[in-house]
Amino acid sequence: MRNQLILAAAAVPSLRVADVEYNTEQIIRLIAENSRCGLIVFPELSVTGYTCADLFGSELLLKKAQEAMFIIAKTTEEYRELTVIIGVPIRFENNLYNCAAVISAGKVCALIPKQYIPNYSEFYEGRWFASGRGIVGQTIRLHGHEIPFGTDILAEDPESGAVLGAEICEDLWVPDKPSTHMSIAGANIIVNLSASDELIGKQEYRKELVA
């Protein structure tokens, strides 16, 4: 890191299920309100909402989500010292992935897919999403842009020089956490995009996972 301090924000926008336009407006508003930060992290699937269920099979929803990602990226052109990470569903090679999109200086810099897909209790993500495990060194072409796609990606914050890693919700709850490998690879900051429900004692347990 060039600087030893980076101001980070965990943003919690008001969201509507499958209302991409509304969700995008809320994300852009929070970016503008917190533009003095060096890093803003939004929840898992924040562009569409987590609970779209079988609507994740809608090509229209996925198309709108992609368009929204680039609209959000465009708004960051004026905040060139800021990195934003949002959650978005992305189709890659005929599979759908729950991704973290790393955005900075008007560009989508990377797409990092969720590796561990929960299928127990109230979670049944495997109905819609594939695991990103094993996807390394790939790129995806979206809207005329070649974007790095995979689980081996670390991004550098343009202002602080911090090396950023991203994982998504369940990735933190497994024994072989992606964040462990990111740390070994040199990540200074690791973010976890989540849309997890609240249960008694869950917050304390979550803290223990990262202690």
Stretches found by the model and what they are:
Residues 1-211:
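Enzyme catalytic cores with a strong preference for nitrogen-chemistry domains
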